[in-house]
Amino acid sequence: MPLLDSFKVDHTKMPAPAVRLAKVMKTPKGDDISVFDLRFCIPNKDIMSEKGTHTLEHLFAGFMRDHLNSNSVEIIDISPMGCRTGFYMSLIGTPDEKSIAKAWEAAMKDVLSVSDQSKIPELNIYQCGTCAMHSLDEAKQIAQKVLNLGISIINNKELKLENA
């Protein structure tokens, strides 16, 4: 079985918080789709809390769209990684990592400004599969940590695994 792209990078060298361009591909019609690794935690050293990650999932995509979508960029999806060290973001277009980092920072500030758990989008039994598994406080702790540490840019060449 061929390795997925995410398993071709050395996770022991991965900084966080950091942005990494994971993949660019073309659609049959020629549009570029970019996939970004938005790494919140250093792999195998730290993870995001379950409830905080779930709440971020509800907030992060909307806030990132507010700051990143344009005539040349449209976010398709932002989904948490199973390892709970970050999110993958797929989008149409090819923005640079610096613009992603700037939007991510602004989105984290937006998370901190959410006043109450009742303001979390789609937090109900009809639109969320585990609506009891949320914590705005934990999401805010994750956001504050990102802002405190600052977001760096990952160079894929520095992370490439040999023989992968």
Swiss-Prot record:
Q: Name one GO molecular function term.
A: iron ion binding
The record's listing under NCBIfam families reads: PRK02260.1-2
Q: Which InterPro entries match?
A: LuxS_sf, Metalloenz_LuxS/M16, S-ribosylhomocysteinase
Cofactor(s) needed = Fe cation
Gene (name only): luxS
Q: A Pfam family in this protein? A: LuxS
Q: Which UniProt keywords apply?
A: Autoinducer synthesis, Iron, Lyase, Metal-binding, Quorum sensing
Record the organism: Campylobacter jejuni subsp. jejuni serotype O:2 (strain ATCC 700819 / NCTC 11168)
Q: What is this protein called?
A: S-ribosylhomocysteine lyase
